[in-house]
């Protein structure tokens, strides 16, 4: 350290540094020497100049606005034309009397229907009033499954005696019987016999045999049927 200070060059550099350091600070903080104005004053001057310029321009260039005349709306409204309302007289509708439909009683239909003629070769239709036994007479020409089964059973059980065939006997026997809902054959008889006794007995026997195949029904029927014996 002593050798560093004892050196002549080093001593001269220290002296110059010591002398010029205060001068440097003096020059640095001196405003008049550098002629430096702060930014705030510059900004204030610019702002004042801008305001003066704006005031001058605004005073010189004021547009003349045309005066507008405002008309107040009048409260008087135009009167609407009054329309005359004509009174419409109501038209009186004529009442038309509708004829009432006369409903005939149920018995009138049964009376007005004409009776159909039936041949002797077809079963006879008779309607009997219900009594204590409540029988109902029917004909086998009706399209009921019950009567079809009875007719089919009679045709299968039809007996044509050999002796009657040999003697060339032919004819028709009208038979009447009652078939109950308990599947019982009652009141079997001949209403109209043929000329030959063989054919009459054969007709009664045919009904007895066929009754074994008669179907059961919920009602009791009174049936009349002709049995025809004819040689082919």
From Swiss-Prot:
Organism superkingdom: Bacteria
Q: Where in the cell is it found?
A: Cell inner membrane
Membrane topology type = Single-pass membrane protein
Report keywords, A-Z.
Cell inner membrane, Cell membrane, Membrane, Protein transport, Signal-anchor, Transmembrane, Transmembrane helix, Transport
Which residue intervals are annotated with compositional bias (Polar residues) in the record? Answer: 59-77
Instruction: Write down the Pfam families for this protein, in alphabetical order.
Output: TonB_C
Q: Which residues lie on this side of the membrane: Periplasmic?
A: 30-232
Cellular component GO terms, alphabetical: plasma membrane protein complex
Q: Where is the TonB C-terminal domain?
A: 145-232
Give the GO biological process terms.
protein transport; transmembrane transport
Q: Which InterPro entries match?
A: TonB-dependent_transducer, TonB/TolA_C, TonB_C
Q: Which residues lie on this side of the membrane: Cytoplasmic?
A: 1-12
Q: Which family does it belong to?
A: Belongs to the TonB family.
Annotated function: Interacts with outer membrane receptor proteins that carry out high-affinity binding and energy dependent uptake into the periplasmic space of specific substrates. It could act to transduce energy from the cytoplasmic membrane to specific energy-requiring processes in the outer membrane, resulting in the release into the periplasm of ligands bound by these outer membrane proteins.
The identity of this protein, by name, is: Protein TonB
The source organism is Campylobacter coli
């Amino acid at each position: 350290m002593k050798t560093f200070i004892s050196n002549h060059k080093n001593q001269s550099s220290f002296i110059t540094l010591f002398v010029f350091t205060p001068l440097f600070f003096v020059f640095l903080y001196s405003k008049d020497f550098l002629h430096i104005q702060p930014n705030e004053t510059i900004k204030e001057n610019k702002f004042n100049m801008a305001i003066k310029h704006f005031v001058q321009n605004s005073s010189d260039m004021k547009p003349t606005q045309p005066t507008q005349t405002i008309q107040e709306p009048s409260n008087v409204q135009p009167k609407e034309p009054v329309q005359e309302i004509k009174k419409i007289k109501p038209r009186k509708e004529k009442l038309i009397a509708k004829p009432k439909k006369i409903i005939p009683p149920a018995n009138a239909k049964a009376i007005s229907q004409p009776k159909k003629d039936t041949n002797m070769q077809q079963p006879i239709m008779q309607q009997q009033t219900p009594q204590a036994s409540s029988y109902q007479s029917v004909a086998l020409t009706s399209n009921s499954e019950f009567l079809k089964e009875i007719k089919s059973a009679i045709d299968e059980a039809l007996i044509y005696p050999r002796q009657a065939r040999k003697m060339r006997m032919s004819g028709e026997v009208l038979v009447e019987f009652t078939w109950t809902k308990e599947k019982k054959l009652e009141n079997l008889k001949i209403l109209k016999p043929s000329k030959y006794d063989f054919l009459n007995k054969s007709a009664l026997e045919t009904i007895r045999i066929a009754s074994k195949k008669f179907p059961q029904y919920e009602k009791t029927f009174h049936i009349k049927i002709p049995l025809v014996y004819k040689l082919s």
